[in-house]
């Protein structure tokens, strides 16, 4: 249809429609230059990488790299840097090289995970001087030793799982189990399944778990009755006395231990609070130590009324066994006149079996045993071990493991330094640490050994 028809139309609405269409056509033609604007092509064809600013390089390793950052960096949307520099309250994952911050814990001074691992402990670096893998040093002749009944199995496997997770999965040391009865197959199967090293099971000879011929059984019974009336812990127990005598004088004689020089005693229902990334056995051997402990405590005086007098008689008759530079001042406050009851808690001890096998200790135990004090009183293996170590060893042969984090019964040893607890994944509460409490002998040990107390100790005494 020709345009003239619209203009000549007699119908008014067609005339108006023609005017509108003409106006639109003129406007489009006069503004056609918009479609040729080069900016529109830039916007529609520019790749995303040019329109969105790239993040700055992560953690530049040199000043030159830092200077190459864009000048308008303050206008760029920041992205998180790599995990080692992430915000301290951000937890990304459980990788040991990507540690979240803990409130109150200072930043580590190490510049790399490798340096952090080297600074973790002097002991770890000493054990790895000839190896690139510090957790797999050359093993020593050592084993765990546990005295347990079949009825204690499920309390014991918790201890085993704990020790394996915190320490032995890295080192695979053997485990010797002893019992005054035959072990059940279930006991053997479960413990073998949990232990990463070899497991060995032994029955205690009857003569090591019974009354010697020289004991007056009636007198021993009267002692148990009297102690029960006095409400002395384990005062009426026969089995407890047999256990203390066995741990004092016979466990180290068992044939299953003949192949070993070192042992670590583990009991049911204990807890290891911290990761142990070095070989504690090898540390003892390399540093010429003999006896190691975690908790020191006072003994109940009513259980050992004549133990010290008997010990003094032995020393008087055998002065040659008293070591130079011994640790007498830890167990006596008056140069040996009386016993102050301090001892190392023997439910955790790492020690050299050859010390117990030696002449001095053998004669000392036999001397004590002949008096009947295990049955006429209630002598414990802990004070006997401790007195022997304090008298027959130079004090520098005794070692306090301040880094284990150990709990048995109601008493806990927990490292006091927050950074250490963080780095070693300790799950203990330092408020429960027993080391510097009143009933502990921790303060005396530090003072008499000439050691500097942790800077946090006053807060937890």
From Swiss-Prot:
Keyword hit for ATP-binding: no
Which ranges does the record list as Lumenal topological domains?
Answer: 36-461
Q: Where in the cell is it found?
A: Golgi apparatus membrane
User: Residues in the active site?
Assistant: 349
Q: What is one GO cellular-component annotation here?
A: Golgi apparatus
Residue ranges under compositional bias (Polar residues)? Answer: 35-52
GO molecular function list:
alpha-1,2-mannosyltransferase activity
The main enzyme category here is: transferase
Keywords in UniProt for this one? Answer: Glycosyltransferase, Golgi apparatus, Membrane, Signal-anchor, Transferase, Transmembrane, Transmembrane helix
Q: Sorted alphabetically, which InterPro entries does this protein's record hold?
A: Glyco_trans_15, Nucleotide-diphossugar_trans
**An example Gene Ontology biological process:** symbiont-mediated perturbation of host defenses
Q: What cystine linkages occur within this chain?
A: none
User: Transit peptide: present as a keyword of the record?
Assistant: no
- One Pfam family name is Glyco_transf_15
Q: Where is the composition biased (Basic and acidic residues)?
A: 117-126
- Enzyme Commission number, as recorded: 2.4.1.-
Q: Where is this region: Disordered?
A: 35-138
Question: Topology with regard to the membrane?
Answer: Single-pass type II membrane protein
- Span-the-membrane segments of this chain are 13-35
Q: Give me the Cytoplasmic side stretches, as residue ranges.
A: 1-12
Q: In which residue ranges is the amino acid composition biased (Low complexity)?
A: 61-70, 106-116
The record's comment on protein family reads: Belongs to the glycosyltransferase 15 family.
Describe the function of this protein. Answer: Involved in O-glycosylation of cell wall and secreted proteins. Transfers an alpha-D-mannosyl residue from GDP-mannose into lipid-linked oligosaccharide, forming an alpha-(1->2)-D-mannosyl-D-mannose linkage. Mainly responsible for the addition of the third mannose residue in an O-linked mannose pentamer. Can also substitute for MNT1 by adding the second mannose residue. Important for adherence to host surfaces and for virulence.
What is the name listed in the Swiss-Prot or TrEMBL entry for this protein? Glycolipid 2-alpha-mannosyltransferase 2
Q: Which organism is it from?
A: Candida albicans (strain SC5314 / ATCC MYA-2876)
| Gene (UniProt) | MNT2
